[in-house]
Amino acid sequence: MATPGELVKVIAATLGEDEATVTQHDRNLLIAGLRTKGGRGRSAAKVTAHDAARLLTSVLGSHRVRDGVDTVRRYLQTQEHHAHWHQHHPDELRGMGKPNVWEDYGIPELASLPREHTFIDALAVLITLASEGRLIKELGDFHPFEGIKIIVTSPRTHARISMHVFRHKDDHKSVQADYGSNEPPSEWMKDKTGKVLPPPTRATVNPRLDRWVEMNAMPLLYIGALLAGKIDELPKIEGECTSLR
């Protein structure tokens, strides 16, 4: 099992972030009760896949470090778009497909996620698969890092996980899961019969600027190797930000 400090180093190195910045994200999550606590020595905290998923989300989805805790709390209140639609608009399902977009992709742990699972839950599953050595096998040998694209938006709550595996022309599959707020639709979205309506026009413009960050599979694979105690088996990453070892 890995320590929080080791996780910070891996995330900083694989995302190209300053280690001090990621350390502050981790400290803020600890204070907010969003990261596993522990003591010193043998009782020191050992991070979990969910700890790693929360720290990744904090770093990716926050323009400012001080926003990290709020970012994680927002993404802990998300739901995949198809599941949300099936739950709140059961009479308007034409073209929506199944409520769990992961169901036909072929990874049991993702397919068995409940409808109410969050973006962070899905991210934790991918990290667990990486720690078991199964994610790299799933991605194949053809540009495996590019088999996954993860986008996190701020301050708007929207994240996307895309997976595409191509081995040859007759062996390829893909999935895209979009996560937004799990709140029920606002009242303006339905008329008296329950039919969904377009949003009302506004007289003012919201000046907020949405930002999004994209990453590939590399951070997941390195975090998984760290949790499995196999980080030394992967190529060393060095840069201006930090070094893994």
Regions found by a protein language model. Give the residues of each.
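Basic amphipathic alpha-helical segments that dock to polyanions
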Residues: 25-32, 47
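Acidic, glycine-rich loop-and-strand cores that form catalytic or ligand-binding grooves
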Residues: 96-140
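A short, Lys/Arg-enriched interface patch at domain edges and termini
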Residues: 52-75
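Conserved hydrophobic residue
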Residues: 35-36
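Leucine-rich, amphipathic alpha-helical/linker segments
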Residues: 68-89
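Short, Lys/Arg-rich nucleic-acid/phosphate-binding segment
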Residues: 39-45
